Amino acid sequence: GSFASVSQRAEPTAASAAAIAELANLDLDDFERYYTLTLLEKFNQKAEKIANPTRQFSQDGNVFAGLSPWSSPVDFGTCMHTLIGYGVRFRTPADALYLNDELAFNLYAAIVELYYNLPFPAPVNQAPWGAQADWYHFSITMPECVQNTCIALRGFYDLSDIARAIIDAYLPAPTFSLGWQRTAGNAMRMCLPYCYGQLLHGLSAAEIGAQPEVRYVLGLIAFPRVATGNGIHMDFAYFDHTDVRATAYLINSYFTFSYYNFLFGSHVVNMDNLYRCISLVGSARGTAHPALLSRNGSQFSNVLGHFIAYADGVVSADFSKILTIRTPRYFGSVVGQAPNVAYYEADPTNNTHAALWAMTRKIWPADGAVFNYRAQTVGFESGVILASNLNEPVVVPTTTTSTSSFLPSLAHTAAATTQSAGAMCMRVRLEELNLEFYSYTLYHAGGMFHLYDNVKALAPVSFNPRCVVLVHDTVQNSSVPAWSVASNLKTYNGTTAKHHNITNASSLANFSIRTLPAVGVQTLEQIMSADAVNAGLGVSCFSLLVASEAATDTTSVIKMDVNTFRDLDAKQRDSAGGELSHRRAQRRQLSPTDDQRRHQPLGRPPHSILRQDPFGPLLPFAHRAQSQVGLHYARRRRVRLRQLRVQSVSIQLLMMMTTQGCGR
């Protein structure tokens, strides 16, 4: 019978107990065998790692030369990752250190040293050393290291007792460590070493899988779609920490999923939903929008490109506000904002990426190099409006001892897609960045067009803000000569930045170059005057094109008839109560009838659509490019994006939205 039926007997026979023990041992042996056979494959899927380590072991009690792991949490994390990397080398047949006796002894001695330096019992609401924010090294990285080393050394040294003791103390439950309860992505990582510890205790996989907290984690990795909260949402965007588009957590946990399938059944993980989720944000090169990756500021994952086969095309998450395009020439992705979706999440050590997450507007050309951000450069990226600090990233600290998410105080966003083009427009107010703006982004065959309109500083500024158009990292890409002359047509690393004026509107500032030696970057920028931004009239307009296609681009931007503008009463627009009453009033208005739509001249939206614009002053514009895109009266769930009108060489974007669905 099942283990459950056996365990309910008052006094199991010696034979049944022996059978249970044998079954449990088989589960442990099978798991360790599978783990060893797939070690290199799974390690290659692991985002956080030190691959092919060469750091010298030491005999001074610190495990590795140059590290102080028993006092420095950063060094401790480096030590754990290095041990994992050496364990992989030890079990990789093609590696020079394959089954090396000296390496085996050093790995064994390192775990023994770890055991004698850790406090037992584990601290509560505090890391063993360092700040509270350093918990991650001890709750996630360390148990993975202990598991990895114990399995790698099987047949050479037996670390079972030490591994059991460490995991028991620091992972007493799959969702609990150091006195803190963990959920979602963290729990996915913690649960696997916990299950291994239970196998070392002699439990079977079936018995482990029946534990309530393990069942909770298995429920998470089943990846059912959810309407709100943690998990894969109905539009396939992944959320963690309730309101954060935290695909990085999913990426960091991806390597564990096959282990769960091996232990608990091949259908534990819903790979279809997982595929759609990864496809929404990723690319074959591993690039992704920074807001969908880690809090330390990143546009590249060294494993994301290896998870699935990415198809070219355009995909969007209507309610989570994500738009992604993949073409043979470039990858593009932009995120919008919604009232209950965090535009930024900070922790005690990562607090300078708010602008990067909220305002990155760029393309990643297929033939361009990818340079990940340095700590000094996180605040400088294409699309970022510099309105608080011109020379270094803006710091927006966490409000707790752990992570804090930040929501926009006003947000409306809508997106529309075809097979070869995508558009996103939004109005957003970001208190922590002292900004409110309207944003219009169009991805087409040749690259990206972008317009910021009605840019406003919430608190007046005394300097001229500017929008970053292109960035040259002079440290990581020092082989490319420094920029010396500004131009309204500037090419760098496969991307050509192109300046646009708007017909029937005041000319915009020419691009200018700014060099920041202390940061190690040069920026191509478009300046907006302080007077304009203080008055809420700042404008920036440019294209980022694949360099090989730039010469054939014929984009022009046209400000339409003034009668297409509609403004709200200023007092009503700037007050929360007025905004709410306005939105309620708009919901009562009737949508334009099909008859009204049929009899409207091409290029002009029905008047009743204009009256439903919740954005206040909304700048319709026409984008002429060599694109063949067809999308009429696009409807994305409850979001209405009217008059994405297409002719052979003309895409007229007249983005008029109802309030229904714009915020969510």
UniProtKB/Swiss-Prot annotation:
Metal-binding as UniProt keyword: no
Keyword vocabulary terms for this entry = Membrane, Viral envelope protein, Virion
- Locations of Basic and acidic residues compositional bias? 573-582
- Which compartments is it annotated to reside in? Virion membrane
Function statement: Component of the polyhedra envelope.
Q: Which InterPro entries match?
A: Baculo_ODV-E66_core, Chondroitin_lyas, ODV-E66_C_baculovirus
Tell me if Membrane is a UniProt keyword of this record: yes
Query: What highest taxon heads this organism's lineage?
Result: Viruses
Region of interest: Disordered:
573-611
Q: Which residues cross the membrane?
A: none
Family statement: Belongs to the baculoviridae E66 family.
Q: Which Gene3D superfamilies match?
A: Baculovirus E66 occlusion-derived virus envelope protein, domain 2, Chondroitin AC/alginate lyase
GO CC list: membrane; viral envelope; virion membrane
- One Pfam family from the UniProt entry? Baculo_E66
Q: Which organism is it from?
A: Lymantria dispar multicapsid nuclear polyhedrosis virus
The identity of this protein, by name, is Occlusion-derived virus envelope protein E66
